[in-house]
Amino acid sequence: MANSLYALVDGNNFYVSCERVFRPSLNGQPVIVLSNNDGCAIARSNEAKALGIAMGAPWFKIKQLQETHGLVALSANFCLYGDLSDRMMSLVAGLGHRQEIYSIDESFIDMSGVRGDLIKRCRTIRERVLRWVGIPCCIGLGPTKTLAKLANHIAKSAERKPGSYPAELAQICNLASLDQAALESVLA
């Protein structure tokens, strides 16, 4: 286990990002995707999160934000999300040895024994996913899947909320490469 290394690649605000691929005019706007029957928010853009919209917020309670803040609410298009997920996962598979698709927008990659500059390798995959599929993603690396998930959370938080974590951990965070003091600081 000491030599194990996993990456977790996770699409950012995945359903909203999928919608923005085909509707770039939505970039920079507060956007949510609603559940079946448009009952509640199941995905939120960073702009919508900044308005305080919680995951699972009932549509009838936040509907007024359309008028007051220009909130765009979209009905879910699961066929579209599945297609873009398939494209993303096929690119992500090239990151390491084995892939375990964890959800529609998350994939664990076994990177144990992969040689070379791992951050550069992750950056290349991240850039390909963005360029070829249109989906922004963050990558977390750790010696276990749980720590890779935590590293991904740190990578997303460092990007979305500057100052919450060191800036160099934004987008791609490798917990396995941090020295003890840096690791303790991040986990505090």
Where are these regions (language model features)?
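Gly/Gly-Pro- and Ser/Thr-rich, intrinsically disordered tail segments characteristic of DNA damage-repair
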Residues: 1-188
